[in-house]
C-alpha cells in the first residue's frame, strides 16, 4: 500500500485586475523540488519515491535542486509568465484547474467574478450567514466539489467600491514523480484542501472584498521593500506578519508538509481547519507511519469494505469499537463542542470494550449515526477504529514498538498506573508465549484497571492483538472422494471445465486461497468437507467458509455472523483437520 503525502512544493497567489495578471505571493521563500531520477528498483522502492521524504534523516542535496527565487523569478520561471499561465479565461474558472509542466503540477480552483459583478451567486436563503460559527460550518462543509456552486448568501461589499479584481487563484504546486500515486494525490489535495480553502476565501471576497484588499496590501509591501533595495529573502519573510492572507497560505503550507492540521483564521471571520487525510491501516511493517503517528493501526485482517476498498476511509462495523487516542477531557478541550451535543455525549460514552452497537443503544441513536460520529473523530486523528478490547483475547508486544522511548514511556505509565507493575514487566510478559490477556490479571477486582492499562498500551503502539487467520486445507483423501463423486455423476463427468481443473490438480494436499471465488473443483472439495461431520454441521461450516481466506480474523468472524462464541469454537474443533490456522496482528 502506497502512502499518499501532499508532495507540496509551494503555494502561489495570483490575481487578475483591469491592468493585467499579477503574481502576488508565494510560500516558501525558496521552494525546493525533488529531482525525478530514474530508478530501477522493485515496486516497493518505486512507492517510496512518491512519498514526501519526512523520514530522510540525511538530506541528500544531490537529489534536490533549488532555483533561487527573487523579486521576478520563482522555481526558474518568471513570475509574470506564471501569473499569465495561472490566470485562465472565465470558461475555465470556478472548477478544477490542473496543469503539468516540467514535472510540476499546478493545481487550484481559479475564482472569477460573475457577469453581474458579484463574486457569489445570490440565492434566496433560509437564514443569512452572519456569525463566525455559521461561516466556519460553511467552509468546512461545502456542498459541492467546486466552490462556484455554494448555496450561501452573502451581503456584498459596497457597490460604490466595485472590484477591480476579476480573478484570484490560489495555486498548489506539487511534485508527484510516480504515476501510481499521481491521480490519488492530486484528487486528495483538491478535494480535502483546495476546495475548502478557496470556498472560505471566496466567501470573504464576496462579503468584504477581502482577497482583493489583501492582494493590494501585499503588492504595496513588495513594491515598497523592493524600491528600498531590501533583499528579497528579508522582506518576503516578513509579509506573512503583515498580511492575514499571506499568513493563511504560509500556515497551510507548513502544516501540510509536516502532516499537521492547519488551523486558519481568515480575516478574523472564518475559522477553518485543513487536514491531509491519512491511511488508517497498514498490513506491512515497512510503513513509516507506524513510527510517527499512533492513528495508523497494523492489521493483516480485512478492515475495509470489500466492495469499496480504501486506505483513507476508515472501516467501521457494528461489532468494532473506537479507541480514543487521548483521554476524554483532552479531546473535549481540543474539539469545538456544543455543551450537551451528541458528539460530546458520544465521546463521553466511548469505551474500547463497547461495540458500536452497544454505544448506539446507550445513546439511543442508530448505528449509522454512530458511524458518522466515529469517522469524524478518526478523520481528525482523535481516535482509531479497532476490534473491541476483551480480556479473553490475546495481546502481544507490538513489532513496531519504539524501544528508544521506553524510559520516558515507563515514567508516564507509572504516573498513570501507580499500583501496577512497571511497563517493562508487562512488555516482558506479553513477549513470552501468547496467551489470553485474562491469564495475567490477578483477580476479578483488577479487570477494570487492567483493561484501562491495555487501552493505554494499544493507543501508544506498545501492544497489538494477536489474531488467528484461517484457510481451508484439502487433504488427499478429500480429493480422492471428489474424483469418485465426479466419476459417479454423469453431469459432472461430462463437464469439460471441471474435467480440465481435475487434470491440472496433482492430487496432493493443498489450500483454497479464496473460497468466495472458488473454482468448480474447489467447490466440490468444500461441499465434501462440509458433510464430513454430518448434515447437522454442514450448514454451520458453509456459513463461515467465505471468511476462511486468510484475511478475516477469527475474533471477528463469530461476531459478524452472529454466532455464539461457544458454537464457533465447536465448528472449528469439528473441522480442525480441514483448517489451516496462522497467527498475525
Swiss-Prot record:
GO cellular component: cytosol; GATOR1 complex; vacuolar membrane
InterPro entries (alphabetical): HTH_NPRL3, Npr3
Annotated stretches, region: Disordered: 117-157
Low complexity bias locations: 148-157
Biased amino acid composition, Polar residues: 128-138
Pfam families referenced in this protein's UniProt entry, alphabetically: HTH_NPRL3, NPR3
GO biological process terms on file: cellular response to amino acid starvation; negative regulation of TORC1 signaling; positive regulation of autophagy
PANTHER family assigned to the protein according to its UniProt record, in alphabetical order: CGTHBA PROTEIN -14 GENE PROTEIN, GATOR COMPLEX PROTEIN NPRL3
Family: Belongs to the NPR3 family.
Name of this protein: Nitrogen permease regulator 3-like protein
Species whose genome carries this gene: Schizosaccharomyces pombe (strain 972 / ATCC 24843) (Fission yeast)
